[in-house]
Regions:
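A substrate-engagement module of RecA-like helicase motors
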Residues: 2-37, 87-215, 222-225, 277-282, ...
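A contiguous, basic/glycine-rich beta-loop/short-helix subdomain that forms a polymer-engagement track
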Residues: 182-217, 228-235, 344-390, 394-398, ...
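Conserved helicase motor "Helicase C" RecA-like lobe of SF1/SF2 P-loop NTPases
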Residues: 532-561
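Walker A/P-loop NTP-binding motif
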Residues: 55-56, 75-88, 105-109
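Conserved RecA-like ASCE P-loop NTPase motor core of nucleic-acid helicases/translocases
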Residues: 89-97, 454-455, 525-532, 536, ...
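Signature of the SF2 helicase/ATPase Hel1-core->accessory helical subdomain module
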Residues: 84, 100, 188-190, 195-339, ...
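Conserved RecA-like P-loop NTPase helicase motor core
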Residues: 485, 497-507, 560-667
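Conserved pre-motif I regulatory segment
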Residues: 14-66
Length: 713
């Protein structure tokens, strides 16, 4: 390009950028477009700055990473330029809760304020929509586990006749985690597709069609990556047409992408296959074969694989299994038996598949699972470092079909993968996981020019995006850090107790509860106690039950597992003086504003266990490259996770409270400084009396006081 033409192009681009900046200034001004249309709206400089960065990325088909602190108003900051200039936009969130909030509240608000005629669609995974075919089958079958399930089935049947979306979130009468949903929704494996007699009325297909026609489509990360891998979510037609892709809660992307770019085979899938085949066989070809006898060997082999592991929960690298004779022989023997049973099942089903489309679908599923098992067993490339020990119990079984049927072709995974086994109470999952998703994700982003926006409140370590960008193969220089408008020094006291035992000590959780109890009393409840393991949740809650009874402390105690997360949070807000003890699922995506939450206690720094199979393999690769696994991976990951947990406390300018971190490594280890400097600038203390006075004074509107023992950054 001649220099004169290049200069003209650059000048035109600069003029366009200035025009966009002027438009955004008008929209976000104190008396601007948003303020005129949205009651209570207040301008924030960081919000306008982020909006400009997003607008520029859209204009240049560029990538931008934005860490926007809590209270910045990042949702409006990306929605405004997306609606004005984004073209076809895909907006992906970390949770279905945020997905619903955006679709039902935030997007309509901004669309109305801007007065732009854009169409919006909400697209979820197929497990969120009632399936007419499976609903009819469940009603005809009539075999339900309880009267409650039967009542819920009647509610779902009435709902299916009146709803236009089929989205189970709209049916408040049936809990979203009710077991009955599993039999009235479809999976990728058991969907009949265009051969289904109810295809024209299918809620999933209707949602996908609406998404194809919409200007802005709201999805979640699981759906986005499931499509990238499976082309089975309706996104296959969406992504090529998209001009802009925005990831909110983008800190979750590395973990979600790793899940979907790997391969997983679960015994639950095999049991479901056997049961579906028996049901379809009895329905369409009852006299052809003994269907129960056909499915029995596969069911037995799948259960035997679980019985090969004595422990309830474990995450074991294949190398670790092979190094332990107590597990090695039972595992490989039952795996051989499963391989044989699945092969026999495929062969027997082949001759019956032509009798009905439903049986043909079962045959295709069986073939795919057999191929996946063979690929897992024959992988000679994957390294399987032997971790030091078996990690603590997993947080949840989570063996959902939406997460267990993903598969990337082996060539896509690359040479650096790890094979490992995850054992739950009732199922076993065989995983093959890429140690780096950066090259895979980079390939997915290559090709058609479009804008990519990654945003969250927690993406950096002290403003450095190296760790996050490296995980996804992004350019760390195309990033922006925007601080929260909150006055953290006045709103929050950060407390690290003295004289705590080491985090690995058997007495550690007991010490945490002992230090926490006087703070809980001073706060009048209103507490989150966040633990890094489920084992700690159980021990801490048991101790608190006993101590509350012993000392006559009349505070409601809510514990993870008693009910769904949504139910527990609703009860916590309603009670106003509760203590909630939870693990990983409460570290993020939880918003409790006001006086209901004044104290967040974190038991220890959230370092991933070094005996985790995937982490162990990643650490080995880093060591071979001459890098420090701790500095490059473990520490940045812990910082970002801790920032998420700490972010539960302050959700508005009027919130005030105490963040207690009971891990003295935060102040006693050299790396501790890097961790707390990555947190907002809280006032800090190590004196329990200071904390108790502050908590007792919250009702009097007192701010944290600087003392000789208190530091302010």
């Amino acid at each position: 390009m001649p220099e004169s033409l290049a200069n003209a192009v650059a000048a035109a681009a600069a003029d366009q950028a200035a025009l966009r900046s002027s438009q955004l200034a008008t929209i976000f001004a104190e008396t601007g477009t948003l303020a005129s249309a949205i009651p209570g709206y207040r301008p924030r400089a960081a919000q306008e700055k982020m909006s400009e960065a997003v607008a520029n990325a859209i204009a240049d088909n560029d990538t931008v990473i934005v860490e926007a602190g809590t209270g910045t108003g990042k949702t409006y900051a990306y929605l405004v330029p997306a609606m004005l200039w984004g073209g076809k936009v895909i907006l992906s969130t970390g949770t279905k809760n945020l997905q619903d909030q955006l679709y039902l509240r935030d997007i309509p608000t901004v669309r109305h304020a801007l007065n732009v005629p854009i169409s919006v669609s909400l697209l979820k995974g197929r497990a969120n929509y009632v399936c007419h075919y499976h609903l009819e089958r469940a009603q005809a079958n009539g075999r339900l586990a309880s009267k409650q399930d039967a009542a819920w089935l009647r509610e779902i049947s009435r709902f299916a006749k009146t709803t236009t979306s089929g989205d189970k979130a709209e049916l408040a009468e049936v809990p979203e985690n009710a077991p009955v949903w599993q039999i009235v929704t479809s999976t990728r494996d058991n969907c009949l597709g265009s051969e289904c007699p109810n295809y024209k009325e299918c809620f999933v297909m209707r949602a996908r069609k609406e998404a194809q026609q919409a200007d802005l489509v709201v999805v979640n990360h699981h759906l986005f990556f499931a499509d990238v891998v499976l082309r089975d979510t309706g996104m296959a037609e969406l992504l090529p047409a998209a001009n802009t892709v925005i990831f909110d809660e983008a800190h979750q992307l590395p973990e979600t992408a790793t899940l979907f770019f790997g391969e997983t085979l679960s015994t639950s899938q095999l049991l479901e296959l056997a049961r579906d085949t028996v049901a379809e066989g009895l329905s369409h070809a009852r006299d052809a074969v003994d269907w129960v006898a056909l499915g029995a060997p596969l069911e037995r082999a799948a259960r035997d694989l679980r019985l090969a592991f004595g422990r309830e929960n474990a995450r074991l690298a294949l190398g670790q299994i092979d190094a332990d004779p107590r597990i090695r022989e039972p595992f490989h023997e039952t795996l051989d038996a499963l391989d044989t049973a699945l092969s026999d099942f495929v062969e027997a089903l082949e001759s019956q598949a032509e009798r009905a489309e439903e049986l043909e679908q079962c045959h295709r599923r069986a073939l795919e699972l057999a191929q996946r098992l063979a690929a897992w067993r024959d992988d000679r490339i994957a390294a399987s470092p032997v971790p030091a020990a078996v990690p603590p119990a997993a947080d949840a079984e989570g063996d959902q079909s939406s997460q267990s049927s993903q598969s990337v072709q082996p060539a896509q995974l690359g040479p650096e993968t790890v094979r490992w086994v995850e054992v739950f109470s009732h199922t076993v999952q065989l995983h093959r996981t890429p140690l780096s998703i950066a090259p895979i994700f980079s390939r997915q982003r290559a090709g058609q020019a479009r804008a990519w926006v990654f945003t969250s409140a927690t993406l950096s370590v002290k403003g450095n995006f190296t760790h996050y960008a490296a995980q996804l193969g992004l350019d760390r220089d195309r990033s922006l850090t925007l601080p929260s408008p909150f006055d953290y020094a006045k709103q929050v006291l950060l407390y690290v107790p003295r004289d705590m035992p080491p985090p690995q000590s058997p007495q550690f959780t007991e010490a945490v509860v002992e230090r926490a109890l006087p703070l809980i009393e001073a706060a009048g409840g209103r507490t989150f106690l966040l633990c890094t393991t489920l084992r700690a949740v159980q021990k801490a809650s048991d101790m608190l039950y006993d101590l509350f009874a012993e000392r006559g402390i009349n505070l409601p105690l809510l514990v993870q597992g008693q009910a769904s997360r949504t139910e527990l949070l609703d009860r916590f807000r309603e009670l106003g003086n509760a203590v909630l003890v939870g693990s990983q699922s409460f570290w993020e995506g939880v918003d409790v504003r006001g006086e209901a939450l004044s104290l967040v206690i974190i038991d220890k720094l959230p370092f991933a266990p070094p005996d985790d199979p995937v982490l162990a393999a990643r650490m080995e690769v880093l060591q071979k490259k001459g890098l420090s696994p701790f500095a490059v991976h473990q520490l940045p990951h812990a910082v970002i996770t801790l920032k998420q947990g700490a972010g539960r406390l302050i959700r508005s300018e009027t919130d005030r409270g105490v963040l207690a971190i009971c891990d003295t490594r935060l102040v006693e280890k050299p790396y501790g400084r890097q961790i707390w400097q990555s947190l907002p600038p809280f006032t800090r203390t190590r004196e329990a009396d200071t904390v108790i006075r502050f908590l007792e004074g919250l009702g009097r509107g007192e701010a944290p006081q600087s003392e000789s023992s208190t530091e302010s950054e």
